[in-house]
Each structure stands twice: as structure tokens, then as C-alpha cells.
Amino acid sequence: IATYTSLGATIKNIEMPHADYGIATYYIIAPCEASSNLARYDGAHYGYRTDHAELVEDGTDEGPLVRMYRRTRSEGFGAEVQRRIMLGTYALSEGYYDAFYLKALKVRRLIRQDYDNAFGEVDMIIGPVTANAAFSKGEKTSDPMAMYLEDLYTVTANLAGVAGISLPCGFTKSGLPIGLQLQAAPFQEEKLLRAAQMFQNATDFHTRRPEL
């Protein structure tokens, strides 16, 4: 913020009343979209297909076609993708569609309205990319909720369809990188990239490399 102030920017605090609902909303809508879009990847029409040698009977009552579908999707999708497909299928199922998916769409509309109101007052929104510094690879794979919470500051941009970019802006005492996030109104990518370039021209964080 100090860098942009030195470049002539005027800083103003804004309110985003529905930002706290971003994680819950995103992780209903995104899995629903994943479940719907990835349903076509069955090994017969699109994408990866399991090896024919793997289609031998395995003691189940499944026919060869169902067995091919199951093994193709089990082998072709990673654990996180499978988790999202299951979440999305559940949220879209009868009895839960209205309670989860439709309600999430209504909240997304409120989040978009928050952004519209904010961009009526400012040209750009600035903030952190994540609440914490980077964690070690694989550190939180056993705790999906902890990983999802790291998306708190970025998912609202995806929900609202606004332009966003992240930039390196510093390091922790232990040398872990810290990210700066800029957001601009829809279709204002040129303004966003210009603001990002101004920051990089005034700093050298993007040129630093960690010691390996």
C-alpha cells in the first residue's frame, strides 16, 4: 500500500459485507460445475480410458461397461477432483438442489453486488492473496478444509467474475513468499495489468529467488 501511495494512489477503505460467505459459496458452486462438466469423461466419449487388461472381472456384480466407467474415472481423476465431483453430485441431487446450489447462486449475486458497489468508489481493490504464508508441499493434503480456507481472499473474484492478479510483495522472516492481490472491475484487465506493472517497476520482489 505504501508503494502505491508513493506512486500517487489514493487509498480508501471499502466494505464487502458478503465476503465472509465466499468460501462456502464457492465450494458449492465450483464442485457442482465440476460434477456436471466432468460427467462426460467416461472413457467412451472423452478423455482417459483404463487399460483393457484392467477390465477383468473382480468379483463384483458390475458388467464390463460399468466396470470400465468406474475404473476409468477412479484412475483418471485425482483425489481432490474426485472429492469435488462427489460434493457437486450431492449438492445437485434431489432434495438438496434448492437448499445448497440455488442458495449459493443467490449469495453469489450478493457478492457481485458488493463488487459493483466497491468499484463505484474505487478503481482497484488491493489486499493479500492468502491469510498465511506458503506451506510445505503436501502439508495440508489430509485436511481439505484447511486448504480451502487459504482461498478465502481469492474465491470471491472468481464468483463475481472480476479481474484479478497476484504479485510477489515480500517475504516472511523464514524466507517464504508473500503475495499481493489486485482486483479490477470486469473487462478492466488493461487497467489491472498497468497497475501491476507499476508495482513491479517500483520494487524488486519479483526478481528475488529462494535459496535452494
Language-model segments: residues:
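Short acidic, glycine/serine/threonine-rich loops at helix termini
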Residues: 23-27, 50, 137-138, 176-179
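Short, hinge-like loop/turn segments at secondary-structure boundaries
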Residues: 28-32, 144-145, 183-184
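Structural helix-boundary/capping segments
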Residues: 1-10, 45-52, 82-113, 121, ...
